[in-house]
Curated annotation (Swiss-Prot):
Record's protein name: Peptidase T
GO molecular function term, any single one: tripeptide aminopeptidase activity
Enzyme class: hydrolase
Disulfide bonds: none
Cofactor: Zn(2+)
Compartment(s) of residence: Cytoplasm
Entry keywords, A to Z: Aminopeptidase, Cytoplasm, Hydrolase, Metal-binding, Metalloprotease, Protease, Zinc
Binding residue positions for Zn(2+) 2: D144, E179, H383
GO CC entries: cytosol
One Pfam family cited in the UniProt record for this chain: Peptidase_M20
The gene coding this protein: pepT
PROSITE patterns linked to this entry: ARGE_DAPE_CPG2_1, ARGE_DAPE_CPG2_2
Major localisation: cytoplasm
Length: 412
């Protein structure tokens, strides 16, 4: 079985396991599917030939590829996450394989009229000639991050079967609940024992990322007073309208649909409720730490304004920081970025260095003493029914993992 065949076989099998995390759950991991998947990976890591394969009570899977050199090489790690996003259903994923893709529109689901088009997704024709894997139009695919996870598995298998490629000790980890910001919450950096690591959790070919958002989540509860609408004058307080009023205070242009590059935003992720009570969940993002703090203060000030207007119980705010920009922790060990950059160039891949408009486990791990930049995996349109992945790009990602390991040994 060549690399491409192994990638397809593993990936299509892995995405069929429902591993969506759950923001509302307080268990670790938050869903049983992640435990099921972790147990499967433990067995497969052992089958490949890795050692020190463990899965702890919190669902964190770790394993070791022993060094095959006498050189004193720093221990490096490769990480991916077990869970998939909560934005769209991940149950009963039916991956569709399109070999030698012609670059044109793909009808994902004729019955539901779900069509992946170049008009909506202009990057699509660039994958002409590739083998791509799509959804059937009813679920997300789960390439985020089962593409990265698959690539690590295939790369480790490749290194074991090609002992002429010299490398130091490599540690592998698969983490739960990344999509809800809890990935590193119970990650044992000391037990992992790597000097630094890479998350395989990026997007298109060439992605190399070591700047991430500063991130916070804000949960707002709006409490109203419900009465019969016929006699509601001066009595009713509509909680849903309070939520609408709060949102109206936020700058319209500071939203994901209007921002790019280094621009931050407020994002209304969900709004549920009725006259009596409504709940809104926002995420707050900015690359600049001062701007990040200013955004959080803006939310607090809006809440205060509304409390003064309607009463303290009318709006209740719970806000917490989720992760910070990893750049601060990557810069002192810039060589780990340089080696990844050189590895890509040597494989005729043009590195695309850009800020992550999101977060990875590496965002938090970098602040826990494990500097962790992010590398591409080949996926596009994450978290929805139009998600797809290029197997050709996945193969390139495997080659990058192998080349990074080789270069660390060579330069030791």
């Amino acid at each position: 079985m060549n690399l491409k065949q192994e990638l397809i076989e593993r990936f299509t099998r892995y995405v069929k396991i429902d591993t969506q995390s759950n923001e509302e759950s307080h268990t670790v991991p938050t869903t049983p599917g992640q435990i099921e998947f972790g147990k499967l990976l433990v067995e497969e890591l052992k089958e490949i030939g890795l050692t020190e394969v463990t899965m702890d009570d919190n669902g964190y899977v770790m394993a070791t590829l022993p060094a095959n050199t006498d050189k004193d090489v720093p221990v490096i790690g490769f990480l991916a996450h077990l869970d998939t996003a909560t934005d769209f259903t991940g149950k009963n994923v039916k991956p569709q394989i399109h070999e030698n893709f012609d670059g044109n529109a793909i009808t994902l689901n004729e019955e539901l009229n779900v069509v992946l088009t170049p008009e909506q997704f202009p990057e699509l024709p660039s994958y002409k000639g590739h083998t791509i894997i799509t959804t059937d139009g009813t679920t997300l695919l789960g390439a985020d991050d089962k593409a990265g996870l698959t690539e690590i598995m295939v790369a480790m298998n490749h290194l074991i079967h090609n002992p002429q490629i010299k490398h130091g000790k490599i540690r592998v980890a698969f983490t739960p609940d990344e999509e809800i910001g809890r990935g590193p919450a119970h990650f044992d950096v000391e037990a992992f024992g790597a000097s630094f690591a890479y998350t395989m959790d990026g997007g298109p070919l060439g992605g190399l990322e070591y700047e991430s958002f500063n991130a916070a989540g804000a949960k707002l509860t709006f409490n109203g007073t419900n009465t019969h609408p016929g006699t509601a004058k001066n009595k009713m307080r509509n909680a849903t309208k309070l939520a609408m009023e709060f949102n109206g205070y936020l700058p319209v242009e500071d939203a994901p649909e209007y921002t790019e590059g280094y621009e931050g935003f407020y994002h209304l992720l969900s709004l549920n409720g009725d006259v009596e009570q409504s709940k809104a969940y926002y995420i707050i993002r900015d690359f600049d730490r001062e701007n990040f703090e200013a955004r959080k203060n803006n939310v607090k000030n809006i809440v205060k304004t509304m409390q003064e207007k309607y009463g303290e119980d009318a709006v209740v705010l719970e806000m917490n920081d989720q992760y910070y920009n990893m750049l601060e922790k990557i810069e002192p060990v810039r060589e780990i970025v340089d080696i990844a950059y050189e590895a890509m160039k040597s494989l005729d891949i043009e590195p695309n260095i850009h800020p992550i408009r999101g977060g990875t486990d590496g965002s938090q791990l970098s602040y826990m003493g494990l500097p962790t930049p992010n590398i591409f995996t080949g996926g596009e349109n994450y978290h929805g029914k139009f998600e797809y992945v290029s197997v050709d790009t996945m193969e390139k990602a495997v080659q990058v993992i192998v080349e990074i390991a080789r270069r660390f040994e060579e330069q030791a």
